[in-house]
């Protein structure tokens, strides 16, 4: 959606994207503080007086201290590189009109449990909360995310809200612009994933896409190790075939 990137791509593969609203540079919007004010507050917390002091700091220490201070880096609507909120840009057709393959993983939220609200004590309390929040749409919500398995339903809501809705919007926008558009859901689960209740977690498709499945040294220390031999998904070769 950035005008500066116009003409840079002739096709796109988008994995587990998120088009949520971002902070705008100089003013508060969508219940988010201005990005500049976030920076000012972070500098105060870290006791940094100038940009030069921040640039001179040890990068890892700066990252660690920022994280401990509750700072979460994200995009900024700066009016130049990212001129508008992403959802607004897609809805108004202000994006690269290229063929697109976009998707998300069925277990995206399993590594984002900290984003879930506290689980209600009973299924009845869950249903009451949904009816109070969603009104006339509550029954449709409960049909998709029932109370009989609250944890799985809450994980699914987070997945669909953050990743599924964003992906669908992108694919529909590309299709409406007359471009080939495909949506996938990656739901593969191997034994090491299942043992840790992480089936199809966020980014678990990446080793398959880039062909590093058979190289255990390429994974972070806590990554569930996949079996050595697997066929690669077809989108690995899509950039060659179009």
What are these regions (language model features)?
Residues 1-5:
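Short glycine-enriched nucleophile-adjacent loop
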Residues 14-20, 146-150, 186, 214-215:
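Short acidic (Asp/Glu) and glycine-rich catalytic loops that position anionic groups and cofactors
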Residues 55, 74-77, 141-146, 185-187:
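Short coil/turn segments at secondary-structure boundaries
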Residues 95-142, 190, 204-210, 224-235, ...:
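C-terminal, loop-rich substrate-recognition/catalytic regions characterized by aromatic stacking residues
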Residues 22-30, 86-87, 147-161, 192-196, ...:
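Active-site rim elements
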Residues 6, 11, 15-129, 152-176, ...:
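Substrate-access "cap/lid" subdomains that shape
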């Amino acid at each position: 959606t950035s005008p500066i990137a116009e003409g840079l791509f002739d096709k796109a593969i988008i994995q587990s994207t998120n088009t949520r609203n971002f902070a705008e540079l100089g003013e508060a919007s969508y219940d988010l503080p201005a990005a500049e004010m976030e920076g000012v507050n972070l500098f105060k917390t870290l006791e940094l007086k100038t940009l030069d002091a921040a640039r001179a700091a040890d990068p890892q220490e700066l990252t660690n201290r920022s994280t401990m201070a509750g700072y979460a880096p994200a995009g900024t609507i700066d009016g130049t590189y990212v001129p508008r909120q992403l959802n607004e840009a897609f809805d108004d057709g202000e994006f690269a009109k290229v063929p697109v393959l976009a998707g998300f993983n069925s277990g995206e939220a399993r590594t984002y449990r900290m984003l879930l609200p506290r689980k209600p004590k009973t299924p009845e309390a869950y249903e009451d909360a949904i009816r109070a929040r969603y009104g006339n749409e509550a029954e449709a919500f409960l049909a998709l995310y029932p109370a009989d398995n609250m944890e799985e339903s809450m994980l699914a809501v987070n997945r669909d809200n953050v990743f599924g809705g964003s992906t669908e919007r992108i694919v529909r926008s590309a299709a409406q612009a007359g471009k080939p558009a495909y949506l996938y859901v990656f739901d593969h689960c191997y034994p090491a994933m299942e043992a840790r209740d992480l089936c199809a977690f966020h980014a678990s498709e990446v080793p398959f896409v880039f062909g590093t499945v058979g190289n255990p040294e390429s994974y972070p220390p806590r990554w569930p190790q996949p079996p050595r031999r697997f066929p690669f998904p077809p989108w690995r070769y899509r950039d060659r075939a179009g």
